[in-house]
Design a protein with these regions (language model features):
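Alpha-helical bundle regulatory/interaction domains
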Residues: 2-17, 24-30, 34-37, 88-194
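Well-ordered mid-protein domain cores that form the structural environment of catalytic cofactors
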Residues: 57-58, 64-111
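N-terminal low-complexity or simple alpha-helical regulatory segments
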Residues: 1-75, 80-81
Length: 194
């Protein structure tokens, strides 16, 4: 396992694991209580995490197919996306998740996901009160019914800015983690995302 966190800031973390048990322990703070490797071979996993208060980013990667179960925070609304060139590389609650889907935002549903080999899973958690306040200010009517669908399939052009944003965050995690520890950069990221 390696850790890149030169300033000791607990709000930004980047770790690599070559052991599933250590990876499983590291994702427990994400309320994932079970993580099982489904494909044979050596395990390599990466966790990148940044907590900016009302906004949290998590990037998970593993070189093997895995299944995760757990519970979600009742205080946050989460949005997840998978990054992989193939159309379908994840299953959540028994339903295929495509590369043009946002999923996992119903806080009343537990975590139940299977991801294939070499899939990048990027999650954003927004404080529920802040999320609904911003949604209302922006004129969005996100009813309980919409949120309980737990997945939205979006047109690729509609999703392009969010995918690009997630790719940039993931790139910064992997190449310049120390930038995420700077308050000015955190403010810029929060403004851009929200």
């Amino acid at each position: 396992m390696s850790e890149h966190n030169p300033h000791g800031n607990p709000l930004v973390l980047s770790r690599q694991f070559n052991d599933l048990d250590r990876f499983r322990e590291a994702i427990k703070p994400l309320n994932v209580t079970e993580c099982t490797q489904l494909s044979p071979g050596g395990f390599l996993g990466t966790i990148n995490f940044a907590d900016f208060g009302n906004l949290k980013f998590t990037h998970l990667y593993q070189n093997q197919a895995t299944k995760g179960n757990g519970r979600k925070s009742i205080d946050d609304i989460a949005f997840s996306m998978v990054f992989h060139p193939n159309l379908i590389q994840a299953i959540s609650h028994g339903c295929a998740v495509g590369k043009y889907d946002l999923f996992g935002f119903d806080p009343t549903r537990e975590v139940d996901i299977v991801v294939d080999k070499d899939v990048h899973l990027v999650m954003t958690s927004v404080n529920k009160c802040a999320f609904y306040t911003l949604s209302e200010q922006m004129g969005y009517n996100l009813t309980v019914k919409v949120m309980q669908n737990n997945a939205l399939s979006l047109h690729p052009t509609s999703l392009r800015p969010l995918r690009a944003f997630y790719e940039e965050i993931t790139h910064v995690f992997n190449t310049q983690t120390s930038l995420l520890m700077q308050l000015q950069m955190q403010s810029l990221i929060m403004e851009d995302f929200l």
